[in-house]
Structure formats: structure tokens, C-alpha cells
Swiss-Prot record:
Claim: Nucleotide-binding is one of the keywords in the record: no
Taxonomic placement: Bacteria, Pseudomonadati, Pseudomonadota, Alphaproteobacteria, Hyphomicrobiales
UniProt KW keywords: Nitrogen fixation, Plasmid
Protein name: UPF0437 protein y4xE
InterPro entries per the UniProt record, alphabetical: Helix_hairpin_bin_sf, Put_N_fixation
Domain of life: Bacteria
Biological process, per Gene Ontology: nitrogen fixation
Organism: Sinorhizobium fredii (strain NBRC 101917 / NGR234)
Record flagged with keyword Heme: no
Family, as annotated: Belongs to the UPF0437 family.
Amino acid sequence: MTDLEELKQRVQKLQSRAATAKTQLHDLAECLPNYWTEIVAVAEKTFDAFAQLDAAKRELAASENSR
């Protein structure tokens, strides 16, 4: 598997992880005011997932542009 293929696969996995985190945050918001103490932890997890996804997308774009 080439580096480019590995990056694409990594982006797909991170997209799935970010979508799951987004759904969890949305579900938590629908349950408010119950579970309000979990907001920070779930939001941080969601933020981290999207930050990792953004970094991977930038890396992939740079790799594709360097070809």
C-alpha cells in the first residue's frame, strides 16, 4: 500500500470517528439538562476528532499536490 493510499484510508477512519463524536455531542444536547456534566468531555472528544481529521486532510492535500 502506498503512502497516499494509507493517508486516504486514515482520513476515512478519522471521518467516521468525527461523525460518531458529532452524533454523540448532538445526542447529549438533546438530553439536556440531563447529563449536563458530560458536556465538556464529549465536546473535547469531538473537538479532538475534528482537529485530527483536519490535520489528516491537510496532509493528504499536501501529498496529492506534491505529485
